[in-house]
Amino acid sequence: MGRAIAEYWKTKTAERLRVFSPMFEEDEIPLTTLFRSYEDMPEIERKALDMAKGRILDVGAASGCHSLVLQDRGKDVTAIDISPLSVETMKERGVKKVIEQDFFTLGGQAMEQREPSSLLEWPSRDRVRRSQYDTILMLMNGIGIVGTLERMPEFFKQLDKILAPGGQVLCDSSDISYVFEDEEGMIDIPNEMDYYGEHSFRMQYKDTIGEPFDWLYIDADTLRQKAGRCGYEVELVAEGEHYDYLARITKK
């Protein structure tokens, strides 16, 4: 995706960003959707941006469209993405704080590698606070990076580390059970599927073919269950027109 984003930014034209999955027909991501203005974003994304406050982390920021909106409002926002080309593009577009890193490895790595040899080595409260965020944004189904339900406890453990006291996670996802509806309106999930929202994808742009990756579409009830078991609660903030929703996750 990074190559497609970089080329579109430089030329304002790009070929198809194709998406493949064993469960679905070939699809494509219109690159214009990654460069939208606030006015062109879906209501759910606009609502999330309006709710963002404090120190903000924009996860999987891609081209930085959400970060730029918040930055223009004077917000303290940091964008994170694993793609070097996406990170480069965001910097060229004017995003001031950009990190090339995996969400699951963000924050406090050095202080977790070993026990301190003395009390003097313990991180100060201010230092810990600087590695935490008041709002974590995971938009455009950003929570999908978790990949599988089995990995949800790891996600909440990471929140324990980087979410500031009183902080919030604003994420959107979709209940895709409708994909498995039969003619009678009954949900018919294939027996081999552990959870109908767990899928594998691969992207292709021109001659660049990415590695397969797991992606999670999680329904709101399942998100509540997983969050509750890990000491978090979920508030359903808004529902979209395409089985999508915006959730607010906070520590109990």
List each model region and its residues.
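N-terminal auxiliary segments of SAM/dcSAM-dependent transferases
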Residues: 1-20
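SAM-dependent methyltransferase
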Residues: 7, 165-224, 228
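Conserved alpha-helix/loop element of class I SAM-dependent methyltransferases that forms part
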Residues: 37-55
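Conserved SAM-binding loop of SAM-dependent methyltransferases across substrates and taxa
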Residues: 63-74
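Conserved SAM/SAH-binding beta-strand->alpha-helix loop
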Residues: 83-84
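Conserved SAM-binding strand-loop segment of SAM-dependent methyltransferases
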Residues: 94-106
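A short SAM/SAH-binding and catalytic strip from SAM-dependent methyltransferases
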Residues: 104, 132-153
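A short glycine-rich, Lys/Arg-flanked "PGG" loop and its adjoining helix->strand segment in the class I
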Residues: 153-165
